[in-house]
Amino acid sequence: MSISEACPAEVDVAIVGAGMAGTTLAMLLGKAGRKVALIDPHRVHHEEFRAEKIGMDQMLLFEKLGLDATLKRLVTSTTDTHVFRLGQFFAHEKKAEFTFSYGALINGLRDALPAQVPLTVGKVTEVSTGPDRQRLVLADGAVIDARLLVVATGHGEAVRRAVGVERIEQSKAHSLSMGFDLAISPRNFGHQSVTCYSRRAADRIAYISIFPLGDKMRANMFLYRNVAEAWTRAFRQEPQKMLCELMPEIAARCGNFEIASPVEVRQISLSTTQGHRRDGVIFIGDAFCTTCPTPGVGIGRVMTDVDQLHSVHIPRWLETPGMAADKINAFYDDPVKVAADEDGMRVSYYAKSITAGTGLEWRARRLRNNTARQLMIIGRKVRHLGQRRAPSMA
């Protein structure tokens, strides 16, 4: 990664925010020969508890964009997951997953930026947008003039407010994510990774996912509670005790849940954007809408934005003069983007309802699903018993 001391005065695209969306879009546009300014307040992305795992579906998006080789150097790969439901072993899944520390991943992506796309370290203090050119003023007085402004600032609000666009909360404090390291080593863990679903709806826990991350075992737990409630405070004080009570079926496999780090917590609200259909500026990723991490579709949604902008819209827009709202609206109305956003919201609400919904419909669904799963567990045990008896009967 090169650092720009004097940012380019005139560019095709100015991207504010060098997280997942902003950095990958800048990388792709730079490789395509576009003149790009990538601006972020921080030279090095700080350690931050956010996404820590993706599946093969998301990796295929990176592969489509030619970014998979870069990404695979920054992740830990797994292929084997033992799943526990209803307090019992349920399934052995063979599927590829990729784990990472978010801050380290973003810094690795920044390091892979092409030389023609330096990172401009600075804070945007003024924004002017229009149908032809967009003007950014940084705290040091530097001015960037661009045909298109892309806002990829995640949950940051400063640039959003400067543009005059509002974030609308659809479901406040929708879910809670927790992350922590286990003391047990990957070598002694016994399984490559484990997913354990809560046995009781009253616990309001979706599941815990335990996976290798480098030379340590990492746990992510997804639940439907508030960061300020007594249960959450108690868990942060005594995570080992509460985990052994909540999920005794996997405690022995997890070194009795001895914890080797503080418990990190992230409260998630579902949100959308209002007033974004305007000249010259695009909001992408979490700067446009936020979904729940429990279903695991967030990075896929973010990279769909990047893909559609890079592959479809920006090349078309730059072919002709102007950057009025009619061009911008083509992105927001893109059926691929719309489907990804709508699916992300749909599964966010569904995951909460099927886990902790108290209405008759959701209680009936849980009963149906758990009955079917219990029958599957019994069937597997019967088959296993039959296989054990067969040799002695021969």
Question: What does each model-identified segment do?
Answer:
Residues E5-G19:
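Beta1/beta-strand and adjacent pyrophosphate-binding region of the FAD-binding site
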Residues P8-E10, L60, K64, L71-V165, ...:
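Conserved N-terminal helical subregion
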Residues G30-R50:
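Glycine-rich FAD pyrophosphate-binding loop
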Residues R43-E63:
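Conserved N-terminal glycine-rich FAD pyrophosphate-binding loop of Rossmann-like flavoproteins
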Residues S311-A394:
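C-terminal helical "tail/cap" subdomain of flavin- and related membrane-associated enzymes
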Residues V227-L318:
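FAD/FMN-dependent oxidoreductases across multiple families
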Residues G22-T23:
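N-terminal Rossmann-fold NAD(P) dinucleotide-binding loop
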Residues A152-A251:
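Conserved FAD-binding catalytic core of PHBH/FMO-like flavoproteins
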